[in-house]
Curated annotation (Swiss-Prot):
Pfam families: AA_kinase (PF00696). ATP binds at K12, L13, S14, G15, G55, R59, T162, Y168, D171. It catalyses: UMP + ATP = UDP + ADP. It comes from Bordetella parapertussis (strain 12822 / ATCC BAA-587 / NCTC 13253). The gene is pyrH. It is found in: Cytoplasm. Inhibited by UTP. UMP binds at G54, D74, T135, G136, N137, P138, F139, F140, T141, T142. Pathway: Pyrimidine metabolism; CTP biosynthesis via de novo pathway; UDP from UMP (UMPK route): step 1/1. This is Uridylate kinase.
Length: 238
């Protein structure tokens, strides 16, 4: 049985998630599988917005950016997110999912600019909205963009798709005794020094009482289970 527990959600996808087993770029089979799951969630009637990163193409804090002006490197990273957003939109279109891309940087010939009322209208019409170019400002991560856009559109939860299936007491790759938290409060995560998002994004979600669910994008069906409110990943709550 499948049902939705949330009416409107913000999904944060890292650019690295699009690489699959590749070292760079977009892995075709990975994006096809990912969009299958997104389409399945959209079919439940969930109003879905997505913030996507660009780390599979370029990151402002990556070794390749060393020696560059940080703001310039960050703008390059923002443009990488636009490329990913267009690829994701194209893949969703082939699944019959009506999708719009809005960018925090103006490239009018390619994508429409981020306009909050239009984004809200698209969501209400059942369209998937992909937010590209982060916040449009250097020195802010796409995690922060996810928290910001989530708050702006009135999302009920931020779903952070990662390579691990939740938040653990220690690094599960290094400590075999590490245990996964099913639920944890914002304050407890701070006390335990657990890295959920970068500090700015985490503080924004906490201040806006916007819960975060961390789950694995590589686990089949995890997105649907997270949206359905099942015990999937880790829920960070107020």
């Amino acid at each position: 049985m499948s049902s939705r527990s949330y009416k409107r959600v913000l999904l944060k996808l890292s650019g690295e998630a699009l690489m699959g087993e590749d070292a760079f770029g977009i892995n075709r089979s990975t994006i096809v599988r990912m969009t299958d799951e997104i389409a399945e969630v959209a079919a439940l009637g969930v109003e879905l917005a997505i913030v996507i990163g660009g780390g599979n193409i370029f990151r402002g804090v990556a070794p390749g950016a060393q020696g560059m002006d940080r703001a310039t490197a960050d703008y390059m990273g923002m443009m990488a997110t636009i490329m990913n957003a267009l690829a994701l939109q194209d893949a969703l279109k082939h699944k019959g999912v009506d999708t719009r891309v809005q960018s925090a940087l103006n490239i009018d010939q390619v994508v429409e600019p981020y306009i909050r009322p239009k984004a809200l209208r698209y969501l209400e019409e059942g369209k998937v909205v992909i937010f590209a170019a982060g916040t449009g400002n250097p020195f802010f991560t796409t995690d922060t963009a996810a928290a910001l856009r989530g708050a702006e559109i009135g999302a009920e939860i931020v779903l952070k798709a990662t390579k691990v299936d939740g938040i653990y007491s220690a690094d599960p790759n290094k400590d075999p005794t590490a245990t996964r938290y099913a639920r944890i409060s914002f304050d407890e995560a701070i006390v335990r020094r657990l890295e959920v998002m970068d500090a700015t994004a985490f503080a924004l979600c906490r201040d806006q009482k916007l819960p975060i669910k961390v789950f694995s994008i590589n686990k089949f069906g995890a997105l649907k289970r997270a949206v359905s409110g099942e015990d999937e990943g880790t829920l960070v709550h107020v």
